[in-house]
């Protein structure tokens, strides 16, 4: 079990977090289950790696890739944002992928990861109001360190939390009827 989460000692949030000032803290926890977790503060290491003013672990799902857990983060540097996947093994940072930036100015948010045909696949909700029920998500794929391609994927998506498992995408369903949910094959 691996967890990534944020906390704050004060009143700072994502939009007013600053690398050289008060900022969101980043934590990892890992163990064999909820009653057996070890914790480590990754704030300094992740801010240094990414050059971030703010970052948080996305609420999408993750996978193991090449023997490490892939953890997706939304990273803000000034006014620019991107997704950054970092790799953890037993509370240690063991690698990172290149920054993932959406084509054409699309801002990426909550990201679920999967491994499909040996490639790491990122399935991203769009950031901001346009991402909630916009009818598109952003897909990107690569070897786990570099992104080889990306595209907008049109589907009826309410912009909510979602999960990929292999080539299956599980999400709440239409914006006006979430009760049943949907499973969509990529």
Predicted segments — roles?
Residues 1-55, 63-110, 114-160, 165-186:
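Beta-rich carbohydrate-recognition and catalytic domains
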């Amino acid at each position: 079990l691996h967890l990534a989460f944020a906390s704050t000692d004060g009143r700072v949030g994502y939009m007013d977090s600053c690398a050289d000032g008060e900022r969101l803290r980043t934590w990892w926890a890992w163990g064999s289950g909820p009653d057996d977790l070890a914790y480590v503060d990754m704030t300094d290491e992740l801010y240094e790696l990414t050059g971030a003013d703010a970052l948080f672990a996305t609420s999408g799902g993750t996978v193991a890739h090449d023997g490490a857990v892939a953890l997706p983060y939304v990273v803000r540097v000034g006014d620019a944002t991107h997704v950054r996947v970092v790799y953890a093994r037993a509370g240690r940072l063991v690698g990172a992928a290149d920054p993932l930036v959406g084509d054409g100015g699309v801002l990426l948010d909550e990201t679920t990861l999967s491994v499909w045909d040996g490639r790491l696949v990122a399935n991203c909700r769009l950031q901001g109001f346009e991402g909630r029920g916009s009818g598109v998500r952003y897909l990107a794929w690569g070897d786990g360190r570099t992104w080889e391609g990306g595209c907008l994927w049109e589907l009826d998506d309410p912009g909510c939390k979602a999960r990929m498992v292999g080539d299956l995408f599980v999400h709440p369903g239409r914006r006006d009827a979430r009760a049943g949910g949907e499973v969509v094959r990529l």
